[in-house]
Every structure is written in structure tokens, then in C-alpha cells.
Amino acid sequence: MKLRWFAFLIVLLAGCSSKHDYTNPPWNAKVPVQRAMQWMPISQKAGAAWGVDPQLITAIIAIESGGNPNAVSKSNAIGLMQIKASTSGRDVYRRMGWSGEPTTSELKNPERNISMGAAYLNILETGPLAGIEDPKVLQYALVVSYANGAGALLRTFSSDRKKAISKINDLDADEFLEHVARNHPAPQAPRYIYKLEQALDAM
């Protein structure tokens, strides 16, 4: 798999020389993954509750916060899975039937943060991304949507959600990555997929 991944990157980058090279600078996932793995018992519990692969949760923790539960970004994304209270946090609260949004202290609590991150992944999978058939493509779509929003991803295929999902189902994982690299408005979107693969390989 690693050789296939490397060979694909060479071909893709050769064909996209005018695009941002999302593999540079190289990202060493070893330390972030080691730090994220300490939260695996919580990730397993949250994954079981929400039907999300705990390895995917761990990879997102490694990418988003490097395993630091107190991490706060410039855009005020908070905690291990870098949840924004006013967007994904509010969506999770709504799914749970609660009003308002999570507090900063709640988002810095590892168990609450991971639970909300897993819940949000479930919201994406059963909502805007519902119908994606290939498990690997779904995994890629989940992380791109987690980082940059499902709407931004789907609009690169069609303004109509059903048509977008149908077009996604015509692609394998490598073709999906190439589409994201060529068409997604956020340069970090394909890099997130690159980091995901690095993190999964480091586990």
C-alpha cells in the first residue's frame, strides 16, 4: 500500500505541477500519533457509541492537535479534535437535542471533546455524505469535510447533493484524491488526506 501510495503521489504531482504541492513540507506523524494514542480508550468508547473507526478518530487527533487537549487555534477551534463551538459543536448539541453550544472548558475535556468529534463525524457520514459507497473514499470525504466543510467538498462535484454523491461513487480513492487536489478551493484539503495516510501508517 505504501509503495502504491508513493507511486501515485509521483504521478499526481507530475500532472499537477502548477498546483500546490500538498506533501511539502513533509509531515512526520510518529510523535503526534504517539501522543494521540494515549487517548485510544476514549476514542474506542466514542467510536463504538457513534459508529466511527477509532483509528480515524486517533488520526484526526494527531493531525488537529498533536494529542494536546488544551490546544486552541487562531479560529478558536478547541481541544483534541479542534472543535469550533459555534459550528460543529452546535451541530452536535442539536443532534443530542440540546440548545446552545459547548463551553471552552467542555471542549478541553478529553472525553467530551472526543465524544463530540465522533458525533460530528457521524453527522457528516449520515447527513451530507450519506450514500458514498467506497469505504476509503468515504474516509477521505469525511476528513476533508471535517476540516473544510461538507458543502465545499460536494460543490466541487455538483451544486446538487445527490448528483455530487453519484459522481463521487464513480471514483476510487486515488481518483477522489486527485479530484480534491485539482478542484477543492482549500489548498489544505488534499494535504489533510496526505496527513491522514501518514497517521494511519504510523499506528
UniProtKB/Swiss-Prot annotation:
It comes from Escherichia coli O127:H6 (strain E2348/69 / EPEC). This is Endo-type membrane-bound lytic murein transglycosylase A. Murein-degrading enzyme. May play a role in recycling of muropeptides during cell elongation and/or cell division. Preferentially cleaves at a distance of more than two disaccharide units from the ends of the glycan chain. Pfam families: SLT. Keywords: Cell outer membrane, Cell wall biogenesis/degradation, Lipoprotein, Lyase, Membrane, Palmitate, Signal. One of its GO terms (biological process) is cell wall macromolecule catabolic process. It is found in: Cell outer membrane. It catalyses: Endolytic cleavage of the (1->4)-beta-glycosidic linkage between N-acetylmuramic acid (MurNAc) and N-acetylglucosamine (GlcNAc) residues in peptidoglycan with concomitant formation of a 1,6-anhydrobond in the MurNAc residue. The lineage of its organism: Bacteria, Pseudomonadati, Pseudomonadota, Gammaproteobacteria, Enterobacterales. The gene is emtA. GO terms for cellular component: cell outer membrane.
